[in-house]
Amino acid sequence: MDHNHIPPTVRRTYGTDDLAKAASFAGGFINFGYWQGIDLTSPTPEDRVRSQEQLYRRVLRAFPEPREQLRLAEVGCGRGLGAALALREFRFASVTAVDIHPDQIERARAVNAKALASYPDRLAYTLGSAGELPFPDNSLDGLYSVEAAQHFRELTSFAAEAARVLRPGGRLVVTTFFTAPGAEIAERLKILLASFADGLDVAHPLDDFTTDLTGAGFTTVTTESIGPDVWPGLDRYLADTVPPAHWTRHFLTAWRDGLLDYHLITADRG
């Protein structure tokens, strides 16, 4: 997906609409959250922020020690809060955060101005796409993406680009929601969820992506369902922040019906 050809719904959602301002994404991290250990009796906006931070931590812990030596990049960084968290809490050697949307890069630089000043040589926000990453060959130790790959039009070029920019032995970590296989699944999701109907989200079967990764030269590809710690917590928070009939309440239904699930994927470059 060339950054000069952003799909209209992606351009609008992360441009003029600025999804981070929605109450359901309190805190600006723009992910569904990892709710393990959070009391769901009456979740607060602070709990929502914590859930989103925890999803980043779940991803970043997948990188091996000593992390202080690792040069990382994030694909689909949004407002860039996750990249700042990565440096602050995990002390990676450097993190370069990439997003296809120029408005998001502008916001990331503004929101994280203090972090950029604190880590002038270790934190950066730059324009780029999953299919054309702005890095030389073999230049990174790690690459990660948090709830962004569902917006990529296809994942084959992302897998190939990840393999290109990672050094041998480098690690890719991706988390987002993937679908069950089959054209009928994609059609059912379009009926249930407006984000699939309008093209914001793309139905990517999990098995197709793991095949792309092995085809690109990745080894030790592992997948883990983390849906039980994502969907119930998200839906409980949505119950207090959106109308009862809002389409986002159907994510829980889609998960329970086996149409999609939230996964954590790790893969090492051969």
Show the residue positions of the predicted features.
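Conserved alpha-helix/loop element of class I SAM-dependent methyltransferases that forms part
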Residues: 34, 50-69
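Class I SAM-dependent methyltransferase SAM/SAH-binding core
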Residues: 73-132
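N-terminal auxiliary segments of SAM/dcSAM-dependent transferases
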Residues: 1-27
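Short alpha-helix
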Residues: 201-217
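Short, glycine-/aromatic-enriched active-site segment of Class I SAM-dependent methyltransferases
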Residues: 177-200
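A short glycine-rich, Lys/Arg-flanked "PGG" loop and its adjoining helix->strand segment in the class I
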Residues: 156-171
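Conserved catalytic loop of SAM-dependent methyltransferase domains
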Residues: 219-244
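A short acidic, Gly/Pro-enriched loop at the edge of an enzyme's catalytic core
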Residues: 131-142
